[in-house]
Each structure stands twice: as structure tokens, then as C-alpha cells.
């Protein structure tokens, strides 16, 4: 069974590194409070680790 995680953006991308903005875009997050569901895999986990200070993660 594929596990999903829910990722919610909690902080603004204003003033952060361009690499972090690109990671948010790669996850599909556009604004504060926006949430997306993604499959739980090593690629997504690496992206979350990079911007962990900007997002909240919930296991589904």
C-alpha cells in the first residue's frame, strides 16, 4: 500500500533562498496555508528536510 503525507506551507517564501523557493514549487505549494498530498518516498522526504522550517507534515 502506498503511504501518503499531507504537506502544508506554514511560512512565507519571501526572503528565503532561491533553492528553497524552487523546492516549494516542486512540491506544488504556492501560499501560506496551502496543502498538498504527496506519496511518501525518499525524494519527497529530502525536499521536506530542506524546507522543514516552512512546512508542516502529517502522515495519512
Curated annotation (Swiss-Prot):
The keyword tRNA processing does not apply. It comes from the Bacteria. InterPro entries: Ribo_uL30_ferredoxin-like_sf, Ribosomal_uL30_bac-type, Ribosomal_uL30_CS, Ribosomal_uL30_ferredoxin-like. PROSITE patterns: RIBOSOMAL_L30 (PS00634). NCBIfam families: rpmD_bact. Belongs to the universal ribosomal protein uL30 family. This is Large ribosomal subunit protein uL30. It comes from Baumannia cicadellinicola subsp. Homalodisca coagulata.
